[in-house]
Amino acid sequence: MTIKIHTEKDFIKMRAAGKLAAETLDFITDHVKPNVTTNSLNDLCHNFITSHNAIPAPLNYKGFPKSICTSINHVVCHGIPNDKPLKNGDIVNIDVTVILDGWYGDTSRMYYVGDVAIKPKRLIQVTYDAMMKGIEVVRPGAKLGDIGYAIQSYAEKHNYSVVRDYTGHGIGRVFHDKPSILNYGRNGTGLTLKEGMFFTVEPMINAGNYDTILSKLDGWTVTTRDKSLSAQFEHTIGVTKDGFEIFTLSPKKLDYPPY
């Protein structure tokens, strides 16, 4: 498997793309509240991205009909924005990918809708922490399995399950590239990380078991089979000489809710 190795100039491009993706999530934060539709959030994000001379990557990607993904409660990923209002107590993941100057910045965060119960709050916190545990093992010479192991062991320690069917991915001048970044695995196994690799780390963690269902109606929406809650966070990162760089950090330090 040949994995692209990027230059310092490429890092500069990815910093810009990642920053805009993060700024989009910063921008939308105050708009996520009860009675707002995910379609309205989609339109706001679309306009924000295009006003910054960028393109929302999901729109028309393999036929996806919207500019962002909005995944509510038991939706794991790839939820399609619609006209149904958000309800008090919902949790929602907003996943944004921008194309800026030909480079892709991909990130997602969880949001509370109004007053959220303690159980979903705990799931969200553990999911964020699991992502960061996975990112923190990244350095030249580490293995892909180290990332998955760090995420899986942390999530399972808190009695949650890690989705197997969807993964992180290589990224750069293409949306989804090699390698796949599994959110489960064994230490010391898999591809050896090298300086200059770019990829996403994006654990999807379920309160119940890890089985998922892909909607036969729209061909996109993924839900938990047991209808348990699911949470996800995502960062785009690069492997540096002595560790990692996160390209999609929030400029406003809105890392996880409450914001």
Curated annotation (Swiss-Prot):
Residues binding a divalent metal cation 1, per UniProt: D95, D106, E234
SUPFAM superfamilies: Creatinase/aminopeptidase (SSF55920)
Binding site for substrate: H78, H176, W220
Listed EC numbers: 3.4.11.18
KW Manganese (keyword) present: no
Name used for this protein in its record: Methionine aminopeptidase
PROSITE patterns reported for this sequence: MAP_1 (PS00680)
Catalytic reaction(s) noted: Release of N-terminal amino acids, preferentially methionine, from peptides and arylamides
GO molecular function: initiator methionyl aminopeptidase activity; metal ion binding; metalloaminopeptidase activity
Highest taxon of source: Bacteria
Enzyme class: hydrolase
Disulfide bonds: none
Assembly and interaction partners: Monomer.
Pfam families, A to Z: Peptidase_M24
UniProt keyword terms in alphabetical order: Aminopeptidase, Hydrolase, Metal-binding, Protease
Family: Belongs to the peptidase M24A family. Methionine aminopeptidase type 1 subfamily.
UniProt: a divalent metal cation 2 binding residues: D106, H169, E202, E234
Cofactor note: Binds 2 divalent metal cations per subunit. Has a high-affinity and a low affinity metal-binding site. The true nature of the physiological cofactor is under debate. The enzyme is active with cobalt, zinc, manganese or divalent iron ions. Most likely, methionine aminopeptidases function as mononuclear Fe(2+)-metalloproteases under physiological conditions, and the catalytically relevant metal-binding site has been assigned to the histidine-containing high-affinity site.
GO biological process: proteolysis
Entry function: Removes the N-terminal methionine from nascent proteins. The N-terminal methionine is often cleaved when the second residue in the primary sequence is small and uncharged (Met-Ala-, Cys, Gly, Pro, Ser, Thr, or Val). Requires deformylation of the N(alpha)-formylated initiator methionine before it can be hydrolyzed.
Record-linked Gene3D superfamilies: Creatinase/methionine aminopeptidase superfamily (3.90.230.10)
Cofactor dependence: Co(2+); Zn(2+); Mn(2+); Fe(2+)
